[in-house]
Amino acid sequence: MEFVFLGTGAGVPSKGRNVSAIALQLLEERGQTWLFDCGEATQHQILHTSVRPRRIEKIFITHLHGDHIFGLPGLLGSRSFQGGTTPLTVYGPKGIKQFIEVALSVSTTHVKYPLEVVEITEEGTVFEDNEFYVETKRLSHGIECFGYRIVEKDIQGALLVDKLLEMGVKPGPIFKRLKDGEVVELEDGTILNGNEFIGPPQKGRIITILGDTRYCEASRELAQDADVLVHEATFAAEDEQQAHDYFHSTSKQAASIALQANAKRLILTHISSRYQGDTYKELLKEARELFSNTEIATDLKSFPVEK
């Protein structure tokens, strides 16, 4: 599991930062990539990374402001042009389906893969399979905006091979049957219950990716005990009132949410273009004063998520 930040700026592109898009690479877990927001020129940013459009399985849109969706029609079309045939699902607020349909229709773009658009109308679980589930809550922004909590389900423990070898059980197909929890009878009549030869389960990871938001309780709830919290930091602490007026957060408020939620790690993004060059490091300094395990994303930077 690895983050690749494709765009980390706020509102409009700048020389140093493109607008919002985050890839969550789940190559080891499911051989796919999930994308969170898709601002203008996202597909161009992708060209500079290991992200492959054909591997994008899901796109989660936080809200319908242009800096979060204007790259979507182009990416959907290019995925088809590049030979993508596997299904893709887009999740987002009401209106995202109309936006996609109109853009593709007017431009006569025909995608050659199954494309599903799921409009989120209420909070709760928007996706679940045997590996992950994704929950969402409304945030505090100028228009309807959602944050996402991605929960990896606990992973089955490893087969206790040494224990089996000590009992004289030789490696072979029987190991798989025991791993699957079957009850197996050996040639000498010994009965083995596979569940007794499985180690403790490995705790799944929790990832929280928030859209644009003021400091709010929903952010804390989504981030509770997260291994990684990705939070916007549009403004510095001295501009807290301005952040509130424009429905955004400061770096210090992001750190406060991480602290309250008992998150393990905080990554700041959605940085205003007023912070050019190294001036953005002041945002990082302010956040670390409150929550030390904070990093700030820059375009094309990757962040592995350890198990």
From Swiss-Prot:
The organism is Bacillus cereus (strain G9842)
The molecular function GO annotations come to:
3'-tRNA processing endoribonuclease activity; zinc ion binding
Can you tell me which residues bind Zn(2+) 2?
67-68, 212, 270
Q: Which HAMAP family match?
A: RNase_Z_BN (MF_01818)
- Ranges annotated as spanning the membrane: none
- Please list the cofactors this protein needs: Zn(2+)
- This one is known as Ribonuclease Z
Catalyses: Endonucleolytic cleavage of RNA, removing extra 3' nucleotides from tRNA precursor, generating 3' termini of tRNAs. A 3'-hydroxy group is left at the tRNA terminus and a 5'-phosphoryl group is left at the trailer molecule
Which keywords belong to this entry? Endonuclease, Hydrolase, Metal-binding, Nuclease, tRNA processing, Zinc
Taxonomy-wise, where does this protein's organism fall, top ranks first? Bacteria, Bacillati, Bacillota, Bacilli, Bacillales
- Provide the residue positions that the database annotates as binding Zn(2+) 1: 63, 65, 141, 212
Q: Where is the active site?
A: 67
Give the cofactor binding note. Answer: Binds 2 Zn(2+) ions.
Coiled-coil regions listed in the entry: none
Instruction: Cite the PANTHER family for this sequence.
Output: ZINC PHOSPHODIESTERASE ELAC PROTEIN 1 (PTHR46018:SF2)
